[in-house]
Structure formats: C-alpha cells, structure tokens
Amino acid sequence: MFQVPDSEGGRAGSRAMKPPGGESSNLFGSPEEATPSSRPNRMASNIFGPTEEPQNIPKRTNPPGGKGSGIFDESTPVQTRQHLNPPGGKTSDIFGSPVTATSRLAHPNKPKDHVFLCEGEEPKSDLKAARSIPAGAEPGEKGSARKAGPAKEQEPMPTVDSHEPRLGPRPRSHNKVLNPPGGKSSISFY
C-alpha cells in the first residue's frame, strides 16, 4: 500500500495520502490480491549481483525477422576484397584466360583511331603504300593519275542554311551582341 512518511510535527502538509488511482487500481473488481509480476522491479538494482534477464523476451538489438547488425558481436576483422588490375591492364575476357590487353587510349570516350588487325597482316607496310599512292590512282596505275580527274570533289564550306541544330547555334557574320550579360542597351554596336 502507498504510504507517506511522516514529516516533522506529524502533519502531512500538501502530500497525497492515496495513490492517484485510489486505494486499489484493480479495474475489474476482483477481490484477490494482485500477483507479483515475474519481472524484477526496475527500480531495484544490485550493482554487484548478476543481472536477471528473462530468457523468453527477445533482445532488441536485432530487428524482428531481420539480419543482425553485428555491432555487439565478437569483433572479427572484416576482410575487404581487393580488385587489382592485372599487370597488362584490364581485359574483357570473361573466362579468365591470360590475354594481354591492347594499348589503352588516353580517354575511354575518345574514338579509337586504330583498327583491329588479323595476326598475319603487317600494318606499317600497308599504310606506307597507301600514303605514297595519290588519292585518284590505284596501285597499278602510276602514270594515269594526272589524266584522271580527282576521285573526290572537295566539299563546299558549310553555309548558314545547311547548319545542323545539334552542332550548336548558327554561325553569325556580325559582331552584334544580342543578349549581353548586363541586359540590352539602346546603343547598337555594328
């Protein structure tokens, strides 16, 4: 039962004489005394004694039905996987055979300026032969290059009407600033 300790002089003062729920907080009206709960009193503590925790209450360190975070487990060193590039560079061989990678360009988004060649070809001799022969002549016709006209006409310079919109704004032939950063002024510079 709730009791108030006596104060000096035997008067209670403004202290409550009964608990907030009245003498009995039993709402269902059973005359039996309330059985003490199996849980230990939370306010009672024993620093030197073992803590008594009920075995049937789940721990709240892990989410229900989920995987534990592993924070409170024994500390085991986490092994990180290291992805090292092979000495020859990265390869696209998914089967793991040791194929050396071709020489990489400076940037992967730049277009490749080389052509993959078969194993038996010699690229240097073909390139030298192609450069030494004029564009309008074939390898067998050395003297007829002057007689035949150029095989390819030069493309005309792009005009304003043939401009493609994906290449940016149309080229302008004047120096007039249409939208200056400070706003338009009444003075026109031609």
UniProtKB/Swiss-Prot annotation:
Pfam families for the chain: JUPITER (PF17054)
Main subcellular localisation: cytoplasm
Compositionally biased intervals (Polar residues): 35-44
Chain segments carrying region Disordered: 1-190
Description of what induces expression: Up-regulated in squamous cell carcinoma (SCC) adenocarcinoma (AC), adenosquamous cell carcinoma (ASCC), bronchioalveolar carcinoma (BAC), breast and uterus tumors.
An annotated GO cellular component: cytosol
Modified residue annotations for Phosphoserine: S30, S45, S69, S97, S132, S144
GO term, biological process aspect, one: endocytosis involved in viral entry into host cell
Compositionally biased region (Basic and acidic residues): 110-129, 139-167
N-acetylmethionine found at: M1
Keyword vocabulary terms for this entry: Acetylation, Cytoplasm, Host-virus interaction, Nucleus, Phosphoprotein
Family: Belongs to the JUPITER family.
Subunit structure: Monomer. Dimer. Interacts with TPCN1.
The protein, known as: Jupiter microtubule associated homolog 2
